[in-house]
Swiss-Prot record:
Its main location: secreted. Residues 119-128 have a biased composition (Acidic residues). The lineage of its organism: Eukaryota, Metazoa, Chordata, Cephalochordata, Leptocardii. Keywords: Carbohydrate metabolism, Cleavage on pair of basic residues, Disulfide bond, Glucose metabolism, Hormone, Secreted, Signal. Belongs to the insulin family. It comes from Branchiostoma californiense (California lancelet). Residues 115-305 are annotated as: E. This is Insulin-like peptide.
Length: 305
């Protein structure tokens, strides 16, 4: 071997070392741990590298098998650890990846998702469907039985409202003011209790007394039957056939008649309601000055309206 061939071999050895240094790196301590964590990710790593089945089989062959195949016990290389291979020597990416644990082939357990079955829609028709605004009664048909109502244009029984909801709808739609006026929103009554009837059109603005009565089959009054003064306890003073003697007595008698005729016992109003409503007499008769009218038979004492 001449000198030139020695230089060529030496130069080739230097080039190989330089290439190896550029592709590998010495890794030790925390730097090695950080690089392995980056390469392996969530799999983690171990201190011994993963090897193929053939190499693992060679590692664990018995001495008799070695003698049979090769005639002598082969030299089995001791496994180097992670530090010995990457810190004392250099290791590349493929060597680092061999220390990572294998990927898990088991599928991830998915969290069961609860699904709600669609509920079937109710196909029942509401008997009060379509009654909107002021026409709609308060609550359901069951609540109508327990509420006290007063109607301006008509008076129907609660039983009819319960048994015939369509009839109630027709009646409510036929009113001029298009609504039913409840006497008080939540006054409940028994079956033998019914509200008093008011004589004038402003009666529905005030609460009523509940009067206990026996169940009867009487027919409700028609709207044409207007309340008269005789029904309200007013007794018209018959004309006095005797001629009054003194004007003072005539004035006193006329004042007494007006007081008796215009005095009506007001309805009892609870204390918690009287603070909210201003109670007024339900009937106010017009007042005027009496005058003397001369006729053929006698003098009549009347009142101006």
């Amino acid at each position: 071997m001449n000198l030139s061939s020695v230089y060529v071999l030496a130069s080739l050895a230097v080039v190989c070392l330089l290439v190896k240094e550029t592709q590998a790196e010495y890794l030790c301590g925390s730097t090695l741990a950080d690089v392995l964590s980056f390469v392996c990710g969530n799999r983690g790593y171990n201190s011994q590298p993963r090897r193929s089945v053939s190499k693992r089989a060679i590692d664990f062959i018995s001495e008799q098998q070695a003698k049979d195949y090769m005639g002598a016990m082969p030299h089995i290389r001791r496994r180097r650890g992670l530090v010995e291979e990457c810190c004392y020597n250099v290791c590349d990416y493929s060597q680092l990846e061999s220390y990572c644990n294998p990927y898990s082939t088991a599928p991830a357990t998915a969290t069961p998702v609860r699904t709600t079955e669609p509920q079937p829609e109710e196909a029942e028709d509401d008997p009060l469907d379509g009654m909107v605004g002021d026409q709609a009664p308060l609550g359901s048909i069951e609540n109508i039985e327990n509420l006290v109502y007063h109607y301006d244009s008509d008076d129907i029984t609660i039983d009819a409202a319960k048994m015939e909801p369509k009839k109630l709808k027709e009646i409510l739609g036929s009113f001029e003011d298009k609504k039913a006026n409840p006497v008080f929103p939540f006054i409940r009554q028994s079956k033998n209790i019914k509200p008093n009837k008011f004589p004038d059109s402003f009666a529905h603005q005030f609460p009523t007394d509940l009067v206990e009565e026996e169940p009867t089959n009487e027919i409700p009054e028609s709207p044409s039957q207007k309340p008269t003064l005789e029904r309200l306890g007013y007794k018209h003073n018959q004309t006095d056939k005797k001629e009054p003697t003194e004007n003072n007595n005539n004035n006193n008698r006329a004042r007494d008649n007006r007081t008796k005729s215009s005095t009506v016992e007001p309805h009892t109003v609870p204390d918690y309601i009287s603070k909210q409503y201003t109670h007024k007499p339900l009937i106010t008769l017009p007042r005027g000055t009496p005058r003397r009218i001369e006729s053929r038979d006698s003098y009549h004492l009347t009142e101006l309206r």
